[in-house]
Amino acid sequence: MNKLYTTLLIACLAAGFTACNDDDCEDLHLGNLAHYPIVLKGTFPTESQVLELGETLEITPELLNPEEATYSWLVNGKEYSTEPTFSYKIDNPCRANLTCIIKNKYGKVEMSTSFSSNHDFSKGFFYIADGTFNFYDTEKKVTYPDCYASLNAGKTLGMGNYDSANIIHSNGKFYILIKTSTSNRDHFYVVDAKTLYYENSAVVGANLSGLTILNEQYGLVTGDGIRRIDLKSLNNVTVKDEYMFCFYNSMVYNGKVLTNDTYQKESKVKYYDANELISCLLYTSPSPRDCS
């Protein structure tokens, strides 16, 4: 019996030594594990940090074994700093993901959190300039530039030098139409009007110039033709393929879409039935009627 146990023990030891010949065994050795970057509990925040405008966020992870450790701090996936302490002043309304990677020759540790600003968009107005949203605080008389990017992980509206944008505020949303000749990029954006958070975007059509909101779900987009668009999914269908100014500044009243078909200062106002526009199929736009 003792001989059997001895044989099994030798076999197990042999298997153990054989396994330790693998390249990965060095990393699994207890002596090396003790040298891994170990962050002391409570020195890196796990919950999102909210700061006032003008404050500075500082985070210094404390290591059990800080020797020869290197740091990389990433804000929204882009390296921001390689210092042991992360320091970020909140100059602009912002919302960001933060990643900290600490390495030494034995391994690395990666930690993530997020931070945002406590800001008030109720005392001022948004405007688009240089291809992005800016905010002017009428109380503080301060302009906060590029708020759209700082609140949406660096996203942009992708506007070129010769592009322009129209903004329609409805249903608690900003509907942004990019007038551009580029056909293979997003032209239509949906942004929350209170937070400026991106919600959706789609390729709709080049040279978008106007939007008529028919109800909470549907609208008509004017550009190289008329498209009915689902404002939630952004699925759209062309109901008229000719360029028309009549829907550029139209309005909806009592179920009727009032238009100026000739786009002249003095012309007879006509109307389209809103329900007919909502239900019409591809290239089957109803005809306008005279207002009685």
Q: What is the predicted function of each stretch?
A:
Residues 283-288:
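Conserved small/polar residues in nucleotide/adenosyl-binding loops
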Residues 144-158, 197-203, 235-241, 277-282:
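A short beta-strand motif characteristic of beta-propeller blades
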Residues 54-63:
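A short beta-strand segment in extracellular, disulfide-stabilized domains
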Residues 2, 13-48, 106-125:
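Bacterial Sec-dependent N-terminal signal peptides
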Residues 65-71:
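Solvent-exposed loop segments of extracellular immunoglobulin-like
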Residues 116-140:
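An edge-strand/N-cap motif at the start of beta-rich repeat modules
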